Regions:
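C-terminal substrate-binding subdomain of Rossmann-fold SDR/epimerase-dehydratase oxidoreductases
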Residues: 24, 56, 198-320
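Short alpha-helical segment that forms part of, or immediately flanks, the ligand-binding pocket
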Residues: 91, 195, 214
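Short beta-loop-alpha junction of Rossmann-like oxidoreductase domains
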Residues: 132-134, 183-185, 189, 291
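N-terminal Rossmann-like NAD(P)+-binding domain of SDR-like oxidoreductases, especially those catalyzing
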Residues: 1-180, 309, 316
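A glycine/serine/threonine-rich, flexible loop-to-helix segment
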Residues: 136, 187-195, 256
Length: 320
């Protein structure tokens, strides 16, 4: 069945993959993006050229959005996401990640009228809301223990969503993915930043000696997870999404270095600046996503097979 959806943050990394997945299904998408430094506005041409009038765009901050057209889903990927920036200055994170979500909830609450089932809010959260875990995996029922300003704002937004669901009967589903990777990510994130530093001949800054463990999930698999919960998920539920591939950050950088130099590299440590620390650094994130997998979803992308294409993209095609 053809659906009409809003995607906030449609020109962001994950938002663009979600937008593309919706359009590929033949759905109508109204994209919302305030076009920050991390947005890729070139996507407007791609979406309109390839999908025609099934994609419409509104340049707007979700805090300032005052009206919703009739739709089936509001998929909220709009957010400030870079942990380092949140540590330096948290104001924009509170504004986008908390106040912006509050405005969306109010819009949905007031828009629904007698139609109590639509639109459904699909809210993007993060694995970071749980805090770190030395062993085992976090389930959706675990308490939230965010460790930095970014994850604290995302946890606060989750609480707002659940409260509006209970008090105002706003239908919602929350999705909590692990670290995403793929072509199109802004250069402040580990993988594209590593390529950038190799390209300009600078050492790659790596926190805590590169020992923190991260679970990697391709953005295309994340977008497919959204499609799965739309088609088979239940309103009022939270869904963890994990890539099933875990490794230390230093191992991720080593894979990038090997791909960049095609095997002709010096020892990986010679390309890394280990002097950088990060306050509140989480040692390990890990999620149990059996709930989502029971709906038939599973990741299809293999990290090591994707690295070469990603490195080549950032090496030659990305405008720094």
């Amino acid at each position: 069945m053809i659906k009409v959806v809003y995607v906030t943050g449609c020109f962001g990394f994950i938002g663009s993959y979600v937008t593309r997945a919706c359009l590929e299904k033949g759905w109508y998408v109204r994209g919302i993006d305030k076009c920050t430094y991390a947005s890729n506005e070139d996507l407007l041409f791609e979406f309109t050229e390839k999908y025609g009038d099934r994609f419409t765009f509104e340049r707007e901050d979700i805090n300032d959005l005052q009206f919703l057209y009739d739709c089936d889903y509001v998929i909220n990927t709009a957010a400030e996401t870079h942990v380092g920036n949140s540590i330096v200055s948290s104001k924009e994170f509170v504004k986008s990640n908390v106040d912006g979500v509050h405005n969306l909830l109010e819009l949905i609450k007031n828009h629904r009228g007698e139609n109590t089932e639509k639109p459904v809010l699909i809210h993007f959260s993060t694995d970071e809301v749980y805090g770190d875990i030395e062993s085992g995996d976090h389930t959706e029922k675990d308490i939230l223990k965010p460790s930095n300003p970014y994850s604290a704002t995302k946890a606060a937004a989750d609480m707002l969503v659940m409260a509006w669901g209970r008090t105002h009967k706003v239908p919602y589903m929350i999705i909590r993915p692990t670290n995403n990777y793929g072509v199109g990510q802004y250069v402040e994130k580990l993988i594209p930043k590593s390529v950038k530093y190799l390209r300009i001949g600078k050492k790659i800054p790596l926190h805590n000696n590169g020992m923190p463990l991260r679970n990697w999930l391709h953005a295309a698999d994340t977008a497919e997870a959204v499609m799965t919960i739309i088609e088979k998920g239940s309103v009022g539920e939270i869904y963890n999404v994990a890539g099933g591939f875990e490794q230390r950050n230093i191992d991720t950088v080593e894979a990038i270095v090997k791909s960049y130099f095609k095997g002709n590299q010096k020892p990986t440590e010679e390309y890394i600046d280990f002097s950088i620390g990060r306050p509140g650094q989480d040692i390990r994130y890990a999620l149990d996503d059996s709930k989502l997998r029971s709906l038939g979803w599973k990741p299809t992308k293999v990290f090591i097979e994707e690295v070469e294409a990603i490195v080549e993209y950032y090496k030659y095609k990305f405008i720094w």
